[in-house]
């Protein structure tokens, strides 16, 4: 998948806060990510690369082993990333028995958009101001080598593109030819447009507003 240079640069982050929990088993120190995991929530908040893919796959497999019949929720706010890392997570999502809810906060771009669409039908969501970006995959770096090597790389790019199109087609209901045309260039969708496109099923209401209407 294509990424802007600014998206590839390491970003500074604040120190993740920890907190103390008291239970019948004693006292333990925890942090937001551990707490989310206990609630069967996985948070993809970085670019999709080998490291983040391994983390996500490990969490999916552990949560399935703990209870294969309970839903897993994946929150997504990611600029996208590598195609092979994307497909590794995608295959694992389809492999585990548990239903997977996908929720976009902020953005699901490139590879992350495919993961958003790959959630269990009826359980794919986004917040109102989230955005989704889809485009054709690409190989990272400058392609160099003999002509025969360039042919191999070109064939691999075409294979990746076809696989991405058929994958999105499977989960959105759009014809693969339509997806090919739409992803010739960056296609940016609002949450409502992503719903119309078939990438998500529901645009979530704010909980405060929902509570006020009850």
From Swiss-Prot:
One of its GO terms (biological process) is protein quality control for misfolded or incompletely synthesized proteins. GO terms for cellular component: cytoplasm; endopeptidase Clp complex. Gene3D superfamilies: 2-enoyl-CoA Hydratase, Chain A, domain 1. It comes from the Bacteria. Its main location: cytoplasm. It is found in: Cytoplasm. Keywords: Cytoplasm, Hydrolase, Protease, Serine protease. GO terms for molecular function: ATP-dependent peptidase activity; ATPase binding; serine-type endopeptidase activity. CDD domains: S14_ClpP_2. The active site is at residues 110, 135. Its EC number is 3.4.21.92. InterPro entries: ClpP, ClpP/crotonase-like_dom_sf, ClpP/TepA, ClpP_His_AS, ClpP_Ser_AS. It is an enzyme of class 3 (hydrolase). It catalyses: Hydrolysis of proteins to small peptides in the presence of ATP and magnesium. alpha-casein is the usual test substrate. In the absence of ATP, only oligopeptides shorter than five residues are hydrolyzed (such as succinyl-Leu-Tyr-|-NHMec, and Leu-Tyr-Leu-|-Tyr-Trp, in which cleavage of the -Tyr-|-Leu- and -Tyr-|-Trp bonds also occurs). Fourteen ClpP subunits assemble into 2 heptameric rings which stack back to back to give a disk-like structure with a central cavity, resembling the structure of eukaryotic proteasomes. Belongs to the peptidase S14 family. Cleaves peptides in various proteins in a process that requires ATP hydrolysis. Has a chymotrypsin-like activity. Plays a major role in the degradation of misfolded proteins. This is ATP-dependent Clp protease proteolytic subunit 2.
